[in-house]
UniProtKB/Swiss-Prot annotation:
InterPro entries: G3P_acylTferase_PlsY. This is Glycerol-3-phosphate acyltransferase. It is found in: Cell inner membrane. Pfam families: G3P_acyltransf. One of its GO terms (biological process) is phospholipid biosynthetic process. The gene is plsY. The keyword RNA-binding does not apply. Its EC number is 2.3.1.275. The lineage of its organism: Bacteria, Pseudomonadati, Pseudomonadota, Gammaproteobacteria, Alteromonadales.
Length: 200
């Protein structure tokens, strides 16, 4: 592992640590998403408490947090496993942000952003899967879990060399959703249009 790789890991984590949900809610004078609705600083909760515009801004920024460092590594010719670790570092920053008392989101948008340099085909299929599941069930968390679960299989067909790093990234996201899985199984999970009955 080179010093350049380590520098990119650290940069990805620090970039991921910028909580766009908290900052954008401050700009729009909305409640702190960590203390309102589902208590999750992510685009879905911001949609619940602030509407489409702030939620869209949060989603875009969170995607870029994953895309930028991975794309830099891609341009530098780093191997797939290193790019996977860069993506994981960005997601860890989002999930455990240094600047916000390590209280972050689920990392779904950032993970999507990390996969974006691998090709539009992969990300488009994952977003389509997410939208279909949300439309059918209303559960953002279930849509995220299913989407990242199929991501390694889609990657195998689109960019097989990146299957291992994408799998690592998806495992992290699924582990982060373990409480959501428990609530889904018990019927206590909130839907995307709910005003935050339970944590997201």
């Amino acid at each position: 592992m080179t010093s350049l790789s380590i520098l990119l890991f650290c940069s990805a984590y620090l970039l991921g640590s910028i909580s766009s949900a908290v900052l954008i809610c401050r700009v729009f004078m909305l409640p702190d998403p960590r203390k309102t609705g589902s208590n999750n600083p992510g685009a879905t909760n911001v949609l619940r408490i602030g509407g489409r515009l702030p939620a869209a801004l949060v989603f875009i920024f969170d995607v870029l947090k994953g895309t930028l460092p991975v794309y830099v590594g891609y341009l530098l010719g780093m191997p797939p496993i290193t790019l996977g670790l860069v993506g994981i570092a960005a997601c860890l920053g989002h999930i455990y942000p240094l600047y916000f008392n390590f209280n972050g989101g689920k990392g779904v948008a950032t993970a999507i952003g990390a996969m974006l340099p691998l090709g539009w085909e992969l990300v488009s299929l994952l977003l389509a899967c997410w939208l279909v599941i949300v439309f059918i069930t209303g559960y953002s968390s279930l849509a995220a879990i299913i989407s990242v679960s199929v991501a390694p299989f889609i990657t195998w067909f689109v960019k097989p060399a990146y299957t291992a790093p994408v799998t690592m990234l998806c495992i992290l996201i699924i582990v982060r959703h373990r409480q959501n899985i428990i609530r889904l199984m018990s019927g206590q999970e909130s839907k995307i249009w709910d005003k935050g009955r339970t944590k997201e």
